[in-house]
Amino acid sequence: MAKRDYYEVLGVAKNASDDEIKKAYRKLAMKYHPDRNPDSKDAEEHFKEAKEAYEMLSDGQKRAAYDQYGHAGVDPNVGAAGAQGFGGFADAFGDIFGDIFGQAAGGGRARGGPQVYRGADLRYSMEITLEQAAHGYDTQIRVPSWAACGVCHGSGAKPGTKPETCPTCHGQGTVRMSQGFFSIQQTCPKCHGTGTYIPEPCVHCHGSGKVKETKTLEVKIPAGIDDGMRIRSAGNGEPGINGGPSGDLYVEIHIKPHAVFERDGDDLHCQMPIPFTTAALGGEIEVPTLAGRASFTVPEGTQSGKTFRLRGKGIKGLRSSIAGDLYVHVQVETPVKLTDQQRDLLKQFEKSLAEGGPRHSPQSKSWFDRVKSFFE
């Protein structure tokens, strides 16, 4: 009897995604599994047919060959897998049901061996100044870490004893459990995937084989780093379990508020008070920058709130080839605590302005004109 088209068997289109193929197979496998149909030869055949179709279409290379050449394009011996019974059912379902039955994130195992886990990542928060962020900064930090226990030398067992092979999983680290109509492989509940257990734990480390310590690490903060960025130190997180890789350490940077500048990306902003005489007459003023002092000319008649841009006086960011700019926002300062002489001089000055008409205060004239038209 000629084989049916694999896509037809699973009930999916030829352009079906891997996820759609997986879902279709899962549905058919549950429907026709022999545990649900113990006396049905028809169900058994449907199950074998679905299993074979899934094995072909879930493999990228086999699927490509099948799409191009049909059944002749795939290994003719693959069909014999159906005669092997149902021993491979759990393996075929491993990628489908693995997340349902508690596969730990970051975990894995060599086939038949104990569970291996990657160590957890650590996070360290560091505050630096704006100057340190702009110019770069080398420092040292002290972070919690783990070291082999000096009493049991990392074995976790009381001196004079040693770990023994787990009697539940026989050193495999996993046990096979039956759930309903199929079986799954789980981490051994007694040894938690290690393949061994400790009859007499070390009293110093409580059987963990490691003790907490503090280690010092060198941290190089690159010039131009911004608030909230993280620096990764590979392998300096928590140690792995059963030979798994260590996690990473992430140093999160926070920049302290600055007394003069506010940062906006690669640009800097500062508020600069100037005397009203300088604003009226113009003149050169000096401003601070992260690289020292700089000066620029304020034109006569400068109004409060005017912004001046100093190119290249900002910060060169991590991904920038040139530095940002410094924006100076001038605030015209009104004098206070005047002497009698100063008051008299200002009154004379005010009188001379009034005699000159609105040409001395164009913004005031414009504002009063708008107010006048508003009430008309």
From Swiss-Prot:
Which spans of this chain does UniProt mark as CXXCXGXG motif repeats? 149-156, 166-173, 188-195, 202-209
One GO term describing the cellular component = cytoplasm
Judging by the UniProt lineage, the source's domain of life is Bacteria
Where on this chain does Zn(2+) 2 bind? 166, 169, 188, 191
Query: What keywords sit in the KW lines?
Result: Chaperone, Cytoplasm, DNA replication, Metal-binding, Repeat, Stress response, Zinc, Zinc-finger
GO BP terms in the entry: chaperone cofactor-dependent protein refolding; DNA replication; protein refolding; response to heat
The compartments listed are:
Cytoplasm
List ligand-binding residues for Zn(2+) 1.
149, 152, 202, 205
Q: Where is this chain primarily localised?
A: cytoplasm
Q: Which Pfam families match?
A: DnaJ, DnaJ_C, DnaJ_CXXCXGXG
Identify the NCBIfam families for this entry.
DnaJ_bact, PRK10767.1
How does the record comment on the protein's domains? The J domain is necessary and sufficient to stimulate DnaK ATPase activity. Zinc center 1 plays an important role in the autonomous, DnaK-independent chaperone activity of DnaJ. Zinc center 2 is essential for interaction with DnaK and for DnaJ activity.
Q: Which family does it belong to?
A: Belongs to the DnaJ family.
Record text on subunit structure and interactions: Homodimer.
What's the protein name?
A: Chaperone protein DnaJ
Q: Which organism is it from?
A: Burkholderia pseudomallei (strain K96243)
* Gene designation per UniProt: dnaJ
